[in-house]
């Protein structure tokens, strides 16, 4: 459950010897990419093989995004793991490639910019925020609803959106970087 997940996160950040799965070298990211998907599968009464596929998808997407960031990022890793969780939950809700891309766009449009200010107990709060955003992104994505390419750093193409996310994570969250990303996007077709 989400409450149990929060307890583990707090215990880990306080130094308690709690075993967890890691993602991209981080226990918190492993918890964030895994437990919300497991909780959603249980709540939806999904069979174990489907749940395992969704958890695998979540973790692989988180790894894919994190690989674009490099070794050090100024953005909170929960945003990456939460994006993976959104994809896993979307899969559990019956979403395919298009809906998963919508969920990614929703996450990048929502939680991008959450700054990493060191590993500490209140990381659990940031994780909770990203898990809530993941559920929202999945619910919207399964309906084909997503942040539009006219907004912020989101592009029409999901890979370009993730490239922008990575640029922001490695080159800073300063206004000049954000403005440059927004002004130099590939222009999407006019929405009519």
Where are these regions (language model features)?
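Short, small-residue-biased leader/transition segments that mark boundaries at the very start
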Residues: 1-8
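Function-dense linear segments that define catalytic or interfacial modules
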Residues: 9-15, 38-42
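Glycine/charged-rich beta-loop-alpha catalytic/anionic-binding loops adjacent to active sites
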Residues: 12-22, 62-72, 115-120
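Conserved phosphate/anionic-ligand binding catalytic regions in large, soluble enzymes, centered on
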Residues: 16-35, 76-80
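Feature representing long, continuous alpha-helical segments
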Residues: 63, 83-87, 132
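Functionally critical mobile loop/hinge segments
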Residues: 92-192
